[in-house]
């Protein structure tokens, strides 16, 4: 029997790895599935584990107040050393571009354990954008024995780096697997739908406002490279858009990071509770976020995963970054880059709200990130490696 260890530590990783954990667990006679979490995003991670009913076998619980990337890397590396010695997995699977992924892959390499990289081959070719994610994924890619690329372009990126084609499998993105499972769950469970409506209300937004065609712009922002002036420009643009479109609701679930919240208060003031059509709400669990995203008109974000998820729901995405490691979405027309440029943010949101044809061209474009069957392909591939 093969022992497979899946390691993740942030909410986005957990969302994309959860359906893979469940897929492996369907084959208990062939695979022993071991889950190790680092707790890099403690509270947000635990929410996802609960939604997908995943109980970790190991929890490094690395988070400490005021820690930096040095601390995170060191704690994951040392913690994984001990976990790998005890668990002795045949293969370690990591996801994407987080510090957890890179440090866990390095720890496995030090013990000569093969590494499988989920969401391999994404590249901006600029190690400082996004930072530190671009370097993280390049380092993880150098360590990986198996590379599970979400798209053909990702595979081409790897082959240009002299990665053997035999080690690469194009799978689609596991986030679409997760998204489809969750949307199906919400739409077929009236009690859950009502519960999520209540969650949103307690968080600060009443979805019953969305009647008679009222539109919603959903906003997320948390990237390190946007801290400082970038966030000020983003928030100023959003503030002016709320004034330009008083009939449209703007909802921003705020990340817990103080570097995100500080510029929001600088632009919008200390009291965020009495703004006309701008709603700053607390961070949402994955189920609640998907529920709100499904009801949105436009998504304005600096997130990576949302560039894949939102188009799966037919939502145009404006990306508040200067580069993206998801050029397939740009080529397909499901996303557009606006950076943190005030004028671009205002003009593109305005165009989508004012021009139906422009909106339809983005919302009806085909999502290039797969069919929801990525996890099955990964499990089948690794089973053949016995």
Predicted regions and their residues:
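Nucleotide-activated sugar donor-binding and catalytic core shared by glycosyltransferases
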Residues: 1-252, 258-386
């Amino acid at each position: 029997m093969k022992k497979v260890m899946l390691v993740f530590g942030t909410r986005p990783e957990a969302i994309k790895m959860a359906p893979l954990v469940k897929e492996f667990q369907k084959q208990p006679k062939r695979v022993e599935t071991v889950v190790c979490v680092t707790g890099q995003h403690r509270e947000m991670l635990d929410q996802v584990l609960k939604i997908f009913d995943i109980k970790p076998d190991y929890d490094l619980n690395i988070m400490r107040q005021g820690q930096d990337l040095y601390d995170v890397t060191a704690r994951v590396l040392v913690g994984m050393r001990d976990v790998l010695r005890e668990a002795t997995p045949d293969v370690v699977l990591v996801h994407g571009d987080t510090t957890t992924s890179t440090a866990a892959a390095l720890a496995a390499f030090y013990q000569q354990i093969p590494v499988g990289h989920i969401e391999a081959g994404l590249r901006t070719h600029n190690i400082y954008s996004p930072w530190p994610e671009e370097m993280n994924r390049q380092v993880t890619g150098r360590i990986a024995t198996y590379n599970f690329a979400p798209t053909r372009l990702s595979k081409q990126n790897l082959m240009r780096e002299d990665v053997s084609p035999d080690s690469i499998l194009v799978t689609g993105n596991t986030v679409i697997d997760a998204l489809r499972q969750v949307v199906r769950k919400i739409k077929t469970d009236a009690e859950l739908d009502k519960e999520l409506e209540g969650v949103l209300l307690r968080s600060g937004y009443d979805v019953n406002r969305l009647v008679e065609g009222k539109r919603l712009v959903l906003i997320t922002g948390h990237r390190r490279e946007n801290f400082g002036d970038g966030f000020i420009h983003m928030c100023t643009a959003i503030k002016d858009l709320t004034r330009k479109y008083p009939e449209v609701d703007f909802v921003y679930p705020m990340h817990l990071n103080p570097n995100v919240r500080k510029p929001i208060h600088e632009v919008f003031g200390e009291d965020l509770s009495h703004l006309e059509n701008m709603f700053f709400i607390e961070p949402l669990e994955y189920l609640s976020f998907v529920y709100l995203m499904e009801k949105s008109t436009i998504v304005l974000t600096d997130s990576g995963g949302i560039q894949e998820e939102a188009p799966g729901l037919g939502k145009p995405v404006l990306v508040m970054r200067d580069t993206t490691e998801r050029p397939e979405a740009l080529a397909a027309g499901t996303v557009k880059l606006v950076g943190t440029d005030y004028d671009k943010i205002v003009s593109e949101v305005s165009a989508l709200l004012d021009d139906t044809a422009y909106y339809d061209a983005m919302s009806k474009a085909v999502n290039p990130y797969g069919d929801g069957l990525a996890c099955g392909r990964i499990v089948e591939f690794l089973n053949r490696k016995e």
